[in-house]
Amino acid sequence: SALIGVAEIISELVSSYDYIIAPVASGGTLAGLIAATHNTATQILGIGVLKGQGYLEELVQSLLPQSYAHWSICHEYHFGGYAKRTDELFDFCANFYQQNNIPIEPVYSGKLLYALKDLLEQGYFPKGSKILVLHTGGLQGSRLNP
């Protein structure tokens, strides 16, 4: 199950974090992060990659063994829904690759990293926060035409 697999990722961390952020679609990864960090001060922030305010929260909660309060989902970065994107997001993904030599795609990782950049610019995270960004892989979305 996703909860067990993600718990293994958390158990291998050698440092603690104030925030862990990850993309959210089916809810399994986020639920695993929430369950694995419930005894810590870490806040879990999901970035919704599909339209689903309310729905995504219910989906994640249904995967958890109990209710936890240290998580939330940000719904402002879905760019129209699952596998949808704008020219702005496409350009962000291309520029990110050019600047960092790390390929990202507009379905999951592009939306996640765009959200991170925007939230940092807005001052969402308190100064000095340690943030772990979970890149969940998958570059199949990079084949989408502009």
Regions found by a protein language model. Give the residues of each.
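Active-site-adjacent helical/loop segments in soluble small-molecule enzymes
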Residues: C74-K127
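Catalytic phosphate/nucleotide-handling subdomain of diverse soluble enzymes
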Residues: L120-S129, Q140-P146
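Glycine-rich phosphate/pyrophosphate-binding loop at beta-loop-alpha junctions
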Residues: A2-G80, L134-P146
